């Protein structure tokens, strides 16, 4: 009789252990959903918002853009470029091509309050800065593709007498129905200057910033 009791208890324990092992991967899968790229993310009614930061100077070796620039001549040159360099059109054309090629139905959003969203990569650490309720009042969509762009200058780490031009494109997908972040990624391009700081013209500066933007676009092209 004892052997029979031990056998029944053993079978029950083994059955429960198997059931627990079967359930664990399912929970893990639900908590670790990741996507290879933005096109893998399931979306419904989609709005696309392009948020371009003014050209500035990056805090060295970071992606933080500062509009307070030590050099007045460089500051004035960047202001001139800002007034005539239409980054929005370049990013918009690229975004529309990718979305059209992949048969998305979407709405481009031209007017918005920049205070409603962070101007960088959105992560679980800063998603609380997204003002979802205000966004939903302004945007009648289920999902929002937010494309943040930062372009500017930094010092060449190998030669402080030269600059580098950098452009970062942050692709964020927000779930407006559930106040959640679905996906985010960064693409960044860098161009090294051939000329020393004191020999830079506005045209050369614009050329290098545009090349850093093109390099970033090329990275996106290769992925999408």
Residues covered by each model-derived region:
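C-terminal/domain-edge helix-coil "capping" segments
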Residues: 18-47, 54-58, 161-224
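Sec-dependent N-terminal signal peptides
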Residues: 4-14
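Active-site-proximal beta-strand/loop segments in catalytic clefts of secreted hydrolases
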Residues: 49-52, 148-150
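N-terminal segment of the mature soluble domain
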Residues: 55-146, 180, 184
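A charged, solvent-exposed segment within the mature domains of Sec-exported extracytoplasmic proteins
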Residues: 124-192
């Amino acid at each position: 009789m004892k052997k029979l009791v031990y056998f029944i208890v053993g079978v029950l324990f083994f059955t429960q252990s198997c059931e627990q092992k079967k359930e664990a991967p399912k929970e893990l899968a639900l908590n670790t959903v990741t996507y290879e790229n933005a096109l893998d993310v399931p979306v419904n009614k989609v709005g696309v918002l392009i948020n371009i930061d003014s050209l500035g100077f990056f805090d060295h070796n970071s992606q933080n853009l500062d509009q307070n620039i030590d050099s007045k001549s460089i500051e004035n040159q960047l202001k001139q470029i800002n007034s005539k360099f239409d980054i929005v059109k370049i990013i918009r054309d690229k975004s529309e091509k990718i979305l059209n090629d992949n048969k998305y139905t979407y709405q481009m959003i031209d007017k918005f309050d920049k205070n409603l969203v962070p101007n960088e990569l959105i992560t679980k650490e800063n998603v609380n800065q997204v003002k979802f309720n205000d966004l939903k009042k302004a945007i009648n969509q289920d999902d929002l593709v937010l494309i943040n762009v930062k372009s500017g200058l930094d010092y060449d780490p190998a030669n402080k007498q030269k600059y580098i031009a950098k452009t970062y494109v942050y692709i964020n997908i927000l779930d407006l129905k559930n106040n959640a972040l679905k996906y985010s990624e960064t693409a960044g391009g860098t161009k090294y200057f051939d000329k020393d700081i004191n020999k830079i013209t506005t045209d050369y500066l614009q050329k290098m910033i545009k090349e850093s933007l093109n390099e970033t676009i090329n990275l996106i092209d290769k992925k999408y």
